[in-house]
């Protein structure tokens, strides 16, 4: 009904390949700050968060060389300022959809750096180099 009434645009897959499509509800950019906030509020222990977001997904999905700080594993790390207070805003969202269900949600604890394969790629919210990410190996 939405398309037949002219309320939306249709894109063929070849016109808009992922990741250049406006995806549905975002969460990748906000889940870690929200979860760190739960650590700071005493709802979750830091080691539980590491298990939930780093180690266990790699174990469950069989993702190779990720999820742990170990020799031979990819040096992918997130640097967090546990005391940094941020109010999440739609304008901060890098996803093409441009919004978040956490708009105006205040968090304590925020990522200030990202290291991918040993290279600092984000610092204080600024992308420093073009993505060097590689497809996951299972």
Where are these regions (language model features)?
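His/Asp/Glu-enriched, well-ordered alpha-helical/loop segment
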Residues: 9-82
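C-terminal cap of metal-dependent C-N hydrolases
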Residues: 17-20, 74-136
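Single conserved hydrophobic/aromatic residue that forms the stacking wall/gate
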Residues: 1-11
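Conserved beta-strand positions that form and line the central face of beta-propeller blades
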Residues: 1, 68, 101
